[in-house]
Amino acid sequence: MNIAKLAFDFDDRFKDVFTNNVKTVNSISVEKDVVYNDTLPDVCTLDIYCPPLKGRDKYPVLVDVHGGGWITGDKYWRRGLNRAFADMGLCVISPNYGLSPRFKYPECVSHLFACFKWICDHAEERRLDLDNVLITGDSAGGQLACLVLAIQNNAEVKARIGAVDSPLRFKGGMLVCGAYDPDSMAKNIFSNKLFLEMTGYGRKHLREFKDYDLMNPVNFVDKDFPADVMVAYGRFDAFVGGNEKILFNRLNELGIPYREYRAKGAGEHCFHLWHY
């Protein structure tokens, strides 16, 4: 039994009752399950949330990467959040990506880069402003979003993971409750099955995984990391509490400015799903 998967699934479904099914924004148009990678049409789909243009020529774009511990989760569980983002004037693109154990990490990262290429290929017809693109993600999605920001200008790493290149470059983003520190997560006994499905290695042998370095996006944060990033976290996050510290330390070391948000109150994992 994968306790971590059960916990992530329960968290999505529990919050869904109180948020996604209650809060709606009627002015937002939604296009669901658009295939962005023809080689994996059952996996690589995205939803698009667009507000009225209201006289503008193009939409600023936000890519939202869902969480779920790399082994579960779906864009479906972020539909309320994405409607709220779209109501702020953004065109929100919410992709699904390959989950473990079917896809071993970091295949999911290459899927996201295929999504970014799709955005570039369809920017003109969908009136997307490629000079004004942000990324956000929570939990595993926060880790993936952070890695994307760290390697978007790193051709060597992108080639290593088989990621297709595109001219899309994110100007910044919002990282929420990101799982940046695999060493910290490996101390939790319930992470063993998660890591086995994700990498083929249990928590005690995780460092033997050939792509272990890619699990920690902080390893790739350099001077090219965008300065317009907010890092949000909860005080009592049972899953990834304290993971934000290694990212803060690296950004401070490089002198890269960032915005920090610590959730008020309990500040549980993915607290933001309650607050839109």
Task: Describe the function of each predicted region.
Residues M1-Y276:
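Alpha/beta-hydrolase superfamily serine-hydrolase fold, recognizing
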